[in-house]
């Protein structure tokens, strides 16, 4: 999906020409948008993701052996991000036990149920898309963009947020602050905030 993608930051990363990236995202983008842009320029060496089926280029690179993939169930990946931000090095979860996704991982029984050990996720740089930021870096997200952005903001050693607007301190209701500014290192106002639609459907009149 493309909801909550910091498209301008992805474009800047592409234009930088940096190679050998390990990307953490719930998906691999689509052709021509999101992380699909970095796949086109062959800047990604490894993807940690939950779903990669929308991108034909990713499939080709994986089958060619030019990109590595680490698949995680979505809930597990979200918790790995949250653990990284909270300073929790690892946790046990029953999700995925006995499947190829967890082969080779430590397993233990709790209350008669098997669990596997998952480690926290950290990022050298977290690229985040938020709706608004105030001048102290407090972020608020719109609707489903409040998915993986908040936990990934906390899991980054450096967090850069692309926003649609920067407002004065106090303009965001405290109850609407989804990511406190303590986690945010840089704020960028994105240009040309076009909503990319994966499958545009219109009613025939």
Annotate each PLM feature.
Residues 1-205:
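Conserved alpha/beta enzyme-core scaffold
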């Amino acid at each position: 999906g493309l909801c909550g993608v910091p498209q301008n930051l992805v474009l800047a990363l592409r234009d930088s020409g940096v190679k050998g990236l390990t990307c953490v995202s719930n998906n691999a983008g689509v052709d021509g948008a999101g992380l699909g842009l970095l796949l086109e320029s062959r800047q990604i060496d490894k993807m940690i993701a939950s779903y990669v089926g929308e991108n034909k280029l990713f499939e080709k690179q994986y089958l060619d052996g030019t990109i590595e993939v680490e698949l995680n169930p979505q809930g597990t990946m979200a918790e790995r991000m949250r653990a990284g931000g909270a300073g929790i090095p690892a946790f046990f979860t029953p999700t995925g036990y006995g499947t190829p996704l967890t082969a080779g991982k430590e397993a233990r029984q709790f209350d008669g149920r098997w669990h596997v050990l998952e480690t926290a996720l950290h990022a050298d740089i977290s690229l985040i898309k938020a709706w608004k930021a105030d001048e102290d870096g407090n972020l608020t997200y719109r609707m489903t963009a409040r998915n993986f952005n908040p936990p990934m903001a906390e899991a980054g050693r450096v967090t850069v947020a692309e926003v649609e607007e920067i407002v004065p301190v106090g303009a965001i209701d405290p109850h609407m602050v989804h990511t406190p500014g303590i986690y945010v290192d840089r704020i960028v106002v994105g240009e040309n905030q076009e909503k990319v639609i994966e499958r545009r459907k219109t009613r025939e009149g």
